[in-house]
């Protein structure tokens, strides 16, 4: 998992606006790389701040789209105006490839000083962990991530330092005065 500071530093090292936005949406919406790279313009529901995602097994889910990401997506789209793909290759005929985006991610991670071996999937992992740290129910996170099995989501419920500190405070209050 990466901290917010590390993610911001990593994204700041991405030169291509299309690659940067694709990685940002992976983090901001908890998407798999395959879901992000193949996002179509029609997947955006700007009025309701939602994205329609076609996930594993062709299953559809709706995820919240933060307003800052929607604004950035609109600005990016105005630069290429591709009628189909949000993140097109240079020729516009196909979406950006997962392989190329993965290479961009690894290069940016190195440039940002991230020494641990990370893949783009760490953005999705970080999204899920942040939601759980903020008290979002595991079942809600399961739905947002498109996990068929709650056990898959449970992987993200490891105790992070903010969770430990919060837990210590709760337990201290519960046990005080016994």
PLM regions and their residue ranges:
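Conserved catalytic core of the tyrosine transesterase superfamily
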Residues: 1-178
């Amino acid at each position: 998992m990466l901290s917010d500071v590390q993610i911001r530093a990593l994204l700041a090292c991405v030169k291509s606006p299309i690659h940067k936005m694709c990685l940002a949406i992976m983090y901001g919406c908890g998407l798999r790389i395959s879901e992000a790279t193949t996002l179509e313009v029609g997947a955006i529901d700007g009025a309701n701040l939602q994205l329609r995602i076609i996930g594993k097994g062709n299953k559809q889910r709706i995820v919240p789209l933060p307003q800052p990401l929607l604004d950035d997506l609109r600005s990016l789209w105005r630069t290429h105006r591709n009628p189909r793909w949000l993140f097109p290759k240079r020729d516009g005929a196909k979406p950006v490839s997962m392989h190329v985006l993965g290479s961009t991610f690894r290069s940016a991670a190195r440039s940002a000083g991230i020494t641990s071996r990370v893949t783009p999937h760490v953005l999705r992992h970080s999204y899920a962990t942040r939601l759980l740290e903020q008290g979002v129910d595991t079942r809600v996170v399961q739905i947002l991530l498109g996990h068929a099995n709650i056990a898959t989501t449970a992987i993200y419920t490891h105790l992070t330092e903010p969770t430990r500190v919060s837990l210590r405070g709760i337990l201290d209050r519960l046990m005080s005065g016994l």
